[in-house]
Structure formats: C-alpha cells, structure tokens
Amino acid sequence: MKRPDYRTLQALDAVIRERGFERAAQKLCITQSAVSQRIKQLENMFGQPLLVRTVPPRPTEQGQKLLALLRQVELLEEEWLGDEQTGSTPLLLSLAVNADSLATWLLPALAPVLADSPIRLNLQVEDETRTQERLRRGEVVGAVSIQPQALPSCLVDKLGALDYLFVSSKPFAEKYFPNGVTRAALLKAPVVAFDHLDDMHQAFLQQNFDLPPGSVPCHIVNSSEAFVQLARQGTTCCMIPHLQIEKELASGELINLTPGLLQRRMLYWHRFAPESRMMRKVTDALLEYGHKVLRQD
C-alpha cells in the first residue's frame, strides 16, 4: 500500500493554497526547489501527475483525493491529541459556504463553537451549486450545498431551505412596473446577479414569466449585502432571501413584487467521514441553528 509522507502532502497543499510554488516555499520556509522535489516525490510514488501546472496550479483528480486525505488527517490529529492541543495554534477549519448563508444564518450558528473552541475559520465563499466541488477537491473539510447526495467517504444532512423573494423599493416598482410585473416590463428592469454563473433570477424569470436567460439587463455584484443596498436605493430588483430582509419588508422599505411566487433553495451540510470531535461540534451547531431558522417543509 502506498503511504505518502505528510510533509510531501503539505507541500502539495501549500502550492494549491498559495496559488504557486514561490509563495508555497515562503509559507513552508523552504526553497522553491525543495517544494518541487517533494511534489515530484509524491508523483513518482503514485506514478502520475498530481498537479496541473497552470497559473495558478490546480490538482489532478488523484491530487484532489490526496488533499482530501490530508484534511481528514489534520482533523483526526486534533481528535487524538485532545487536551494536549491547549495553548497551541488554533485548528484551521476550512469551509465552503454560499454568500447568502454567510449573510444570514451561518455566523450566528457558528458563534457557540467559535466562543468555546480554539479554531481559525477559513470561509471560502462560493455559489451553493458549486461548494460541494471544493469538498471534492479537498480544499475544505465541510460545505453548505444544494446537492442532496453525499460524495464518497462523506456525510450529508439537510439544513433547511432559504426562500428567495423578488423584491425592490417602492419607487423602483412605480418606475418600472406601473401596471404590475409583466413580461414586457421586466425586459427593461435591471436585476443583479452574484456572478456570471449565478442563475437564481434567470431561473425565476424563466419559470414564471417565460423570459430566456440573458434577456434582462443585469448587474454583477459579488456581495449578498450589496443586493439589499441596491434594492433599497432603488437601483435594481433582485432575488433576496426572506430571512435577510424581514425588517425591510415589514417597514415597507422593500416590497415583494410577486406575492405568492418565490424561489426555494434547500441546503445540505456535507463533510468528510469520520468526523473529528471538532467537526461534530460544528455539525451539531449548524444543524441545531439551521433547523430553527430555515424552512423545514
């Protein structure tokens, strides 16, 4: 059985995390040549490339499996060392999360764990349709995703759903929808997406108004909080989680443009198996809080 030296795995991990050999060498306090030698040693052991040497480098499928193994080992080390970790460097916990969860329920859910445990969070923000891929690639140890199926050697639990409403300010609605929200009016009303792969508003408009993707003017803004600001200031109409704008809806600062219509996204919590003690704490915290504030029906 091939048993990699974890020093060599850490070199592979550093090249991916630091997006290059030079910064990886600085991170590990060794020469760039030494980093290359360690990765070459790993590749010789497995008889295949573990890195695609692009800019930035990315792991091959086998490289992804090895990085996932490293993540599990790091967490299990924490499990076995237990109280001996007290006073040492806090455990790094890398999680892939969607921006809307981060802007609404995720941080309150993690608050008890952060207050009670010596960990350093590394939250990698990605669309909920793509967070699971970060877990597959071994970049993180847990992911909030819309995918219900667990990856091999992983666990999954349902968190609950975010309900998205199509909203705007009242002045925006009066300007663009004086006769109500119609297909013709929507063609002129600007919307906003998180990135070029965010299809939330496109799916909603196509399903309910038969508007094909790309038919409405669209801003690109990588911030959930900015969606709320853009809607409040009358710049756009957009899809925002109801949980994020309860106060604005109650005060009338924002209005639901399409009462009775919404877009529901069920969220799931994925992580490696077996779980370490620390990951079990994270899982319990996310499930307990998620089941309180997210839709369960």
From Swiss-Prot:
DNA-binding segment(s): 21-40
TM region positions: none
Keywords: DNA-binding, Transcription, Transcription regulation
Domain HTH lysR-type intervals: 4-60
GO terms, molecular function: DNA binding; DNA-binding transcription factor activity
Task performed by this protein: Controls the transcription of genes involved in arginine and lysine metabolism.
Family according to the record: Belongs to the LysR transcriptional regulatory family.
Protein name: HTH-type transcriptional regulator ArgP
Protein source organism: Escherichia fergusonii (strain ATCC 35469 / DSM 13698 / CCUG 18766 / IAM 14443 / JCM 21226 / LMG 7866 / NBRC 102419 / NCTC 12128 / CDC 0568-73)
Taxon lineage: Bacteria, Pseudomonadati, Pseudomonadota, Gammaproteobacteria, Enterobacterales
Annotated gene: argP
